[in-house]
């Protein structure tokens, strides 16, 4: 007599879910690759909360506290003394060689552009690239490229005007956060339309899809236990317990 096992239906459903997730992940990865090829660089889009919108300019790894980056008077005098020592002990060629060595170790600049609607565009540049490349990228991804805009850093608020400067000279290496501003009109209700176009905003959902398949795959193989082995293991443990001598027994 055939008995319908509900566990088989559960297993089939899991396999279908895994297949669908893998197909969605593969499609999302393909779209992300197409966007990377279209824009000529690796980009990410994510949404940040208003609490995390603290004006700062940091590297791509935000692990240190604010006190770590505070410039104290002691740091100033130490830096001044170091500069005087460098001028007296090092020739111009030596300083240039050291600067070139430091620069050669830095291979990328991770720039995050934060928009007023809490969306952040992250793009990777080479330190020797010009800031004009960032301006051109923003023009391609905003929803209204015809509306004039500008980028600025803070604090203090300083508009970026020299687009011919490279990221290294601007101090944007290994990473920096810049802010976007324009004269985009707001609705009567006070809400504004998205600053990024729909195509680039879709990257936020696509990246989530590529990560969503990972926990599903981890549960794709249900744990199977050989029922015949359970009593044997239990019996072996019981035997071991019986053969063990009590602590109080002495020969």
Swiss-Prot record:
Q: Which Pfam families would you find in this protein's record?
A: UBX
Q: Where is the composition biased (Polar residues)?
A: 217-227
Where is it located? Cytoplasm
| GO biological process per UniProt | organ growth; protein-containing complex disassembly
Supply the Gene3D superfamilies for this chain: Phosphatidylinositol 3-kinase Catalytic Subunit, Chain A, domain 1
Care to name a GO molecular-function term for this sequence?
ATPase binding
Ranges of Basic and acidic residues composition bias in the record: 232-243
Where is it mostly found? cytoplasm
Region Disordered: start-end pairs: 212-251
Result of knocking out the encoding gene = Accelerated growth of various plant organs including roots and inflorescence shoots.
Looking at the record, the residues that make up the UBX domain are 104-180
Q: Which UniProt keywords apply?
A: Acetylation, Cytoplasm, Ubl conjugation pathway
SUPFAM superfamilies reported for this sequence: Ubiquitin-like
- Entry keyword annotation includes Acetylation: yes
Please tell me one Gene Ontology term that the record gives under cellular component: cytoplasm
Note the subunit structure.
Interacts with CDC48A (non-hexameric) via its UBX-containing C-terminal domain.
Domain of life, source organism: Eukaryota
Give the protein name, as stated in the record: Plant UBX domain-containing protein 1
Role according to the record: Regulates CDC48A by inhibiting its ATPase activity and by promoting the disassembly of the active hexamer.
InterPro entries, per the entry: PUX1, Ubiquitin-like_domsf, UBX_dom
């Amino acid at each position: 007599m055939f008995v319908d096992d509900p566990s088989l239906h559960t297993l089939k459903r899991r396999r279908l879910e895994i297949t669908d997730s893998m197909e969605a992940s593969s499609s999302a990865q393909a779209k992300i690759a197409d966007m990377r090829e279209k824009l000529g660089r690796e980009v990410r889009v994510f949404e940040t909360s208003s609490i995390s919108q603290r004006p700062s300019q940091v590297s791509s790894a935000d692990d240190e506290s604010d006190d770590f980056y505070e410039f104290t008077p002691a740091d100033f005098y130490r830096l001044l003394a170091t500069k005087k020592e460098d001028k007296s002990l090092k020739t111009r060629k030596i300083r240039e060689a050291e600067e070139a060595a430091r620069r050669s170790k830095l291979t990328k600049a991770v720039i995050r552009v934060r928009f007023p609607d809490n969306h952040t565009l992250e793009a990777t540049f080479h330190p020797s690239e010009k800031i004009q490349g960032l301006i051109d990228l923003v023009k391609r991804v905003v929803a209204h490229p015809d509306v004039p805009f500008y980028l600025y850093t803070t604090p203090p608020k300083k508009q970026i005007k020299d687009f011919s400067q490279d990221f290294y000279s601007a101090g944007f290496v290994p990473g920096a956060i810049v802010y976007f501003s324009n004269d985009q009109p707001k609705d009567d209700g006070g809400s504004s339309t998205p600053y990024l176009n729909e195509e680039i905003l879709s990257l936020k959902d696509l990246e989530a899809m590529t990560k969503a398949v990972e926990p599903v795959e981890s549960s794709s193989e249900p744990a199977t236990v050989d029922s015949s082995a359970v009593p044997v293991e239990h019996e072996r443990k019981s035997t071991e317990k019986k053969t063990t001598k009590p602590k109080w027994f002495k020969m």
